[in-house]
Structure formats: C-alpha cells, structure tokens
Amino acid sequence: MQSSSLNNYNSNKNFIIMLIILFLMEFARGMYILSYLALLPTATSIAVGITSIAISIHFIADATTNFVIGFLLKRLGTKLVLTLGFLLAFASLFLVIWFPTSPFVLIASAILLGIAVSPIWVIMLASVDENNRGKQMGYVYFSWLLGLLVGMVGMNVIFKFHPTQFAFLMSLVVLIAWILYYFVKVRLTNYNTRPVKQQLGQIVDVTKRHMILFPGILLQGASITALVPILPTYATKVVGVSTLEYTMAIVFGGIGCAISMLFLSKIIDKHGTLFMYWVIFGGFVLYTLMIFALSLITNITIVWVLAVFIGLMYGILLPAWNTFMASHIHSDEQEETWGVFNSVQGFGSMIGPLVGGLITEFTKSVNNTFYFSALVFLFLAIFYGIYFVKVNNKTKTS
C-alpha cells in the first residue's frame, strides 16, 4: 500500500515537472515565433518575407520531426533525444542574441526550435494517466496555451522597450526548462531497437490503422488556422473595432478555454464512451454554428460573448477528442502513434492559413473564409456522427 502511494506520488511529481517544462518550452516558442519574428520587421530593416519564411518553416520542421520522433525515442532513448532537443533549442535562441537580425540565423533558429520542441510534446502525451486522461489532457493543453500566450504577450511588452536587447531571455527560459529535466524520470512504454527499415514499415502500419482519425486531426487544425490570417481584417474592417478590442476578444476566448480545460475537461473521465461521442459531435455542430455566426455579427460585445463560448467549447472538445484518439492507440506504441498524430495535425495547421488567406484574396470577402471553416466542421460532425452511430450499434449487438 505504501509502495503504491509512493509510486503515485512520484508519478504525479514527474507529471507536474513535465507540465512546467512544457510551459517553459512553449513560453520560449511564443516569445520567438509568435512575437519576436512577427514584430521584427516593424522595428528593424529585416523584411517581412524573411520572418514569414522563418515562421512557416518552423512549423514544417515541427510537423516533420513529429512524424519520426516517437521511433527515435524508442531507438536512441529519452535521455539522448531530450538532451539534444534542449541543446538545439538553447543553441538556436542563443544565436539570436549575437545575430538578432541575420536572415540566416532567424530561419535556422526557427528550424532548430521546431525540431527541439517535438520530443517534449510526444513524451507528455504518452505519459498521461489513462484513468485521468480527460483531466490531465486539460492540464497539458492549458500549459501549452498559457505558455504560448504569456510568451507572446510578454515579448510584445519587452519588444517596446528595445527590439533586440532582451533577446537573451528566450534562451534563458529554455535553460531553466533544461535544468528542470534532470529532476524528472521519463519512462517509455517499450524500448525498441529494431532496424530502421522495420521502423519505417511501422510508421506506414500506424498510419493505415488510424485512417479513421486523420480527417478529424487534419481538418480541425486546418479549419481553425484558416481564420488566423483574416481575423484582424474582420475585426478592423467588418466589425470596425481597434486592435485593442480585437485583442480583448482573443483574451476572452483564452479565458474561456482555460476555465474549460482546468475544470470542465475532468467531466470526460467520469462518464462513458457515449458521453465522449456526444461531446465531440456536439462540439463540431456548435463550432459550425458559432463560426457561421461570426460572418453575421458586427457588434463587438456579441463577438466577445461568442469568443468566450468558443473558448469554453474548445477547452472541453480538445480533451474529449484526445481521449477518443487514445482509445485507438496500442499501449506499446504510444510514442510512435502520438508522433504521427502530431505530425498530421501540424500539416493541417500549415495548410489552414494558406487556404484561408487565398479564399479571402480571390473572393475579396472574409465571410467566405468563415463559410469554409464552418463547412469543414459540418463535414466533421456528419462524418464522425455516422461513425459513432455505427460503433454504438455494433457495441449493442455484440
């Protein structure tokens, strides 16, 4: 009994430290990718094209690395892979201190940082307790979201004092995360030293076995990120508000999401599979309606209220969807499978802004991008609604 309590204590301690490490790494990413690179053209001679390439290539590096990182963790071990990850992240941001406006350094650092954060995410997802998946995934996504937002906002404030003088803070945050890593014990589900050819075959096998999940993984990311390029235009040109009021809408959405992830996500653990299906289906339907509603609204107060509801729904939909994905994963292939899932999600997030921007550019209307995003969620609601009904009927008859 005492041994069991000690194991639970150590497990919880490891999980909390890993959450802090994830928060710090996403904090550094938010500072560099979402703030520093985005703001640099406004205060220096660096071209917008350079920073845009750096941001895009960061997510490409992240998605590509996710595809193979689970297999590398099994083959090389967590200590080597994570140490190299922290080293790459620290080195990439340390270079920015000395060459803050060098196009080559900015792009190279973005690539290295994209590679470096990948193993943290995969290990975090694979180490979640199955009995408390909804609650713990709420904490994981909260740490991720909080890290990105606080990092971005913090760097935005610091940037106003001096664009490059405080660049050292980014590498300092990574260094703190690196030090914390030595206080946590990371275990994999199963160490694997099979030949590379067999592991590549396993990637194909994992991909084939989880095809039913890929539309949801790919299209959710694409649908949400399709709105990113057009939201500022929608706020200033359609709703007719200032950048500050637009930022408040994002903050309200973030608050709603945080409340949901911290308090509502644990509901998923207390109910059965059918409840999870209803949350996912209902989430997709509500997202369809709320995104479509944005194309009709020109009152900022209503937009703020809608932002809170969107955040609340996202905060419970994400853990429910994660629990649904986890139910398809073999217990000894968690790192590999989560890596593939993250990679597919990353590619969806890359496609979204491109599609959203092109739709607005060619149709000359931001509303058409809202229609596209809403239709994608409607498709997901119908697709998975039919799937859930079939699975539920099969369960009843068996």
Curated annotation (Swiss-Prot):
Q: How does it sit in the membrane?
A: Multi-pass membrane protein
Database matches in InterPro entries: MFS, MFS_dom, MFS_Efflux_Transporters, MFS_trans_sf
Subcellular location field: Cell membrane
Q: Which GO terms describe its biological process?
A: lipid transport; lipoteichoic acid biosynthetic process
Q: Which Gene3D superfamilies match?
A: MFS general substrate transporter like domains
Signal peptide range: none
Where is it predominantly found? membrane
Gene Ontology cellular-component annotations: plasma membrane
Record key words, sorted: Antiport, Cell membrane, Lipid transport, Membrane, Transmembrane, Transmembrane helix, Transport, Virulence
Tell me the pathway. Answer: Cell wall biogenesis; lipoteichoic acid biosynthesis
Q: Note the SUPFAM superfamilies from the entry.
A: MFS general substrate transporter
User: Which positions, given as ranges, span the membrane?
Assistant: 15-40, 46-73, 80-99, 105-126, 138-159, 165-184, 212-234, 246-264, 276-297, 303-326, 338-359, 371-389
State if Glycosyltransferase is listed as a keyword: no
Q: Which GO terms describe its molecular function?
A: antiporter activity
> What this chain does, per the record?
Proton-coupled antiporter flippase that catalyzes the translocation, from the inner to the outer leaflet of the cell membrane, of the lipid-linked disaccharide (anchor-LLD) that anchors lipoteichoic acids (LTA) to the cell membrane.
Q: Family per UniProt?
A: Belongs to the major facilitator superfamily. LtaA family.
Q: What is this protein called?
A: Proton-coupled antiporter flippase LtaA
Organism of provenance: Staphylococcus saprophyticus subsp. saprophyticus (strain ATCC 15305 / DSM 20229 / NCIMB 8711 / NCTC 7292 / S-41)
* Primary gene name: ltaA
